[in-house]
């Protein structure tokens, strides 16, 4: 038994650095859509993790295009594509862990992706991250979520949390009745935000949104995030499903995806 660690990095220089820092990781400098051409020992994986890119640009993936329907639709925006492609590459019981823009959870038009995810996997954890989280590294405020799923294609029904994850809503922004932009209803319940507070503000586009803040040091934030994840994994993660329920394989295959277009 052993762990097989793979990494995909699209940027050449970043890929070279990554391969030097992690000598035991098999690194390929290419796009995620070309993973099937890399000659990895595994074609499906137990864990797929990334801070994924976002944007309204298409990805050419012949395999998903041939499937048509929502698979082809997912290739029209890169963040939707990453979720669907990764879920297709997971072993049953495997974990998908992505930091992503809030568009996946909040945009009404992305409901088809949310439906695909909760119908193919159990929602383990959904945590709304503070808007300033990437300020030091990227110099911009960006709304992000940490979403973790465990692939479970034979699930009987959606949980209450998963049903909430499908829904979006708006809030009153002021006394005149101006409404905020849409936001996912799951983040209205306790223990789903990495924040000490939130308020409605106007963003750089003049739209009203709910902004999340963390007032405290990074160590305290890390400890609170760890506590949230421990709580969610204790409640929702199925170890027997992850281990294959006695199917015999003791190898663990992990893939990390890094993309230069994401802060």
Predicted segments with their positions:
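Conserved nucleotide-binding/hydrolysis micro-motifs of P-loop NTPases
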Residues: 54-55, 103-105, 133, 153-155
């Amino acid at each position: 038994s052993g762990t097989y660690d793979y990494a995909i990095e699209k940027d050449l220089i970043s890929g070279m650095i990554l391969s030097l820092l992690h000598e035991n990781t098999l690194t390929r400098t290419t796009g995620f859509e070309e993973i099937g051409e890399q000659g990895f020992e595994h074609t499906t994986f137990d864990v797929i993790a990334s801070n994924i890119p976002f944007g309204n640009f298409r990805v050419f993936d012949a395999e998903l295009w041939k499937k048509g329907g929502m698979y082809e639709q997912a290739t029209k925006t890169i963040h939707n594509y990453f979720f669907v492609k990764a879920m297709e590459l997971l072993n049953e019981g495997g974990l998908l862990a992505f930091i992503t823009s809030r568009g996946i959870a909040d945009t009404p038009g992305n409901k088809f992706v949310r439906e695909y995810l909760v119908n193919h996997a159990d929602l383990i954890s959904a945590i709304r991250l503070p808007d300033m989280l990437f300020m030091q590294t990227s110099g911009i405020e960006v709304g992000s979520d940490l979403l973790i799923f465990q692939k479970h294609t034979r699930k009987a029904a959606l949980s209450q949390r998963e049903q909430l994850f499908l829904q979006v809503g708006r809030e009153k922004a002021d006394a005149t009745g101006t409404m905020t932009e849409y936001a996912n209803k799951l983040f209205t319940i306790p223990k789903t935000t990495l924040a000490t507070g939130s308020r409605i503000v106007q963003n750089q586009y003049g739209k009203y949104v709910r902004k999340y803040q963390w007032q405290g040091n990074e160590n305290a934030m890390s400890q609170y995030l760890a506590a949230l994840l421990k709580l969610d994994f204790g409640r929702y993660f199925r170890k027997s499903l992850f281990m294959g329920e006695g199917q015999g394989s003791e190898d663990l295959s992990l893939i990390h995806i890094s993309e230069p277009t994401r802060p």
